[in-house]
A protein has these predicted regions:
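Short, low-complexity disordered leader/linker segments with a strong preference
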Residues: 1-59, 399-422
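Extracytoplasmic "Venus flytrap"
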Residues: 32-79, 99-103, 253
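Contiguous mixed-secondary-structure segments that line small-molecule binding/active-site clefts
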Residues: 36-48, 125-208, 212-225, 326-420
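Short, polar/charged alpha-helical segment
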Residues: 47-49, 70-92, 214-218
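Pocket-flanking alpha-helical
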Residues: 74, 97-140, 191-196, 247, ...
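Solvent-exposed, polar/charged alpha-helical surfaces in well-ordered, non-transmembrane soluble domains
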Residues: 78, 82, 86, 106, ...
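Short helix-initiation/N-cap motifs at beta->coil->alpha
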Residues: 97-110, 213-215, 228-241, 337-338
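Pocket-lining segment of extracytoplasmic ligand-binding domains
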Residues: 228-333
């Protein structure tokens, strides 16, 4: 089948002059800064309808990370939109703009502040100096199971809780005029995907390796590969042309861009996750604080459905990735043990360095292991299971086949609820 084109690369977007910020009038917003009556989390629809009865309808511009509504990674945006519009009784309309068509990631913060975008997926990992906590947290995602379904659920819950429980992480958004709705999100475990077979140390030596975060630079160099930094939207063409030989890639990108059609030889860690999977955030712009309180609460509460959609997006894309690799004559295999050890050692050295720099606490490993134990128990309690392996994921997982809202509610009540607008 013909390759699916990658999402539009930010560099390819046509320059445009920013439109004037839209003028909005929020009914019930005292002094133009939020206000009005709110409602308790879990309130009935009748109670919410009463709270918003006198409020004017609003339309908010929403820029998610997916390239289109048909993308395997569109689920999080669609589930969020469905919840918000239904819960608001149609008074909040989310106008989705796909494919970073309004603002690339480099322009997104300005667009959120000046009003061109109201809500967005932000790949903050591309800006480690601006978001040092995401850069640090992306290097501690290896302390839980790599199981193809439960592993993604556990890791998503672990990192979401960590994000909400770290004040300086939340402040990194607020100081830029942004409101975090989900401050730390996963796009799935990392894999390596190559044009050619082989994951031994000899195979890695000299390869051009596309990297997605600062952790990957050190790992690629330890393998004697040459790290090449580029956003995921540029990676398909680079692999297709042979500009790069391999890429670090997560399921959401692998399954939604067709990367594995040109780099079908995938290697994964045998018994642990690869570092780097916490990369992004779901944020609101400057208009959020001017919304009536009840509208703010509806948007915030919608993160339960958005959390469900994030995991669904990961798994749906993961299924497609397995199909793509197989149809392109590739395979999913365990990383060569010697290469995996080199990579794992570097991962732990990066954690040691962050501790030495004071960017992570000395007991961070113990904290993450305790978190993994906690959320593993919750995932088991809620009945989520793996019915096969990653290699045959397309045989036993059906798209949109698992509802993760019950897990999302646990994350919300145990971590996010303390930050709910009030």
């Amino acid at each position: 089948m013909p390759p699916r084109p990658p999402p539009p690369a930010p560099a390819a977007l046509s320059p445009r002059s920013p439109p004037e910020p839209r003028s909005r009038s929020w009914a019930g917003a005292g002094g133009g800064q939020g206000g009005g009556e709110g409602f308790e989390y879990g309130a009935s629809q009748e109670e919410i309808n009463a709270a918003i009865a006198d409020l004017d309808p609003v339309t908010l511009t929403y820029q998610p990370g997916a390239s289109s509504q048909e993308s395997e990674t569109a689920a999080s945006a669609l589930r969020f939109k469905e919840y918000v519009e239904e819960r608001s009784d149609g008074k909040i309309t989310l106008e989705i703009v796909w494919g970073q068509a309004i603002a690339s990631y480099t322009e997104l913060e300005d667009a959120l502040v000046d009003g061109r975008v109201d809500l967005a997926f932000h790949a903050a990992i591309y800006f480690p100096e601006e978001f040092p906590t995401i850069d640090a947290f992306s290097k501690i995602t290896q302390y839980s199971t790599p199981a193809p379904l439960t592993g993604e659920a556990i890791s998503a819950a672990m990192m979401a809780e960590l994000g909400w429980n770290t004040p300086e992480h939340l402040e990194s958004f607020k100081e830029k005029g942004l409101t975090p709705l989900s401050p730390l999100m996963n796009s799935g475990d990392y894999w390596t995907a190559c044009r050619d077979t082989g994951s031994s140390l000899d195979d890695w030596n000299g390869r051009q390796m596309r990297i997605a975060g600062t952790a990957h630079t050190a790992i690629a160099e330890a393998l004697q590969a040459s790290p090449v930094s580029m956003e995921y939207g540029e990676t398909f063409e680079a692999l297709q042309r042979g500009t790069v030989d391999c890429t670090f890639v997560q399921p959401q990108v692998a399954g939604s861009t067709g990367l594995l059609e040109v780099a079908p030889h995938v290697s994964t860690f045998a018994d642990s996750r690869m570092t780097g999977s916490a990369t992004a955030a779901h944020v609101a712009g400057s208009s959020f604080e001017n919304l009536p309180l009840a509208y703010q609460q509806i948007l915030f509460d919608g993160e339960v459905d958005h959390f469900h959609g994030i995991i669904q997006s990961t798994l749906d894309a993961q299924r497609q990735a397995v199909i793509d690799a197989t149809e392109a004559g590739g395979e999913f295999t365990d990383m060569d043990p010697e290469a995996e050890k080199v990579m794992s050692d570097i991962q732990e050295q990066l954690v040691d360095d962050l501790i030495a720099e004071g960017r992570l606490p000395e007991d961070i490993r113990e904290q993450m292991e305790e978190s993994a134990e906690k959320w593993t128990g919750v995932v088991e309690e809620l009945g989520y299971t793996d019915d096969g392996e990653l290699t045959d994921f397309d045989d036993w997982y059906e798209p949109n086949g698992v509802d993760f809202r019950s897990l999302g509610e646990r994350v919300f009540t145990e971590a996010a609820a303390a930050h709910r607008p009030s």
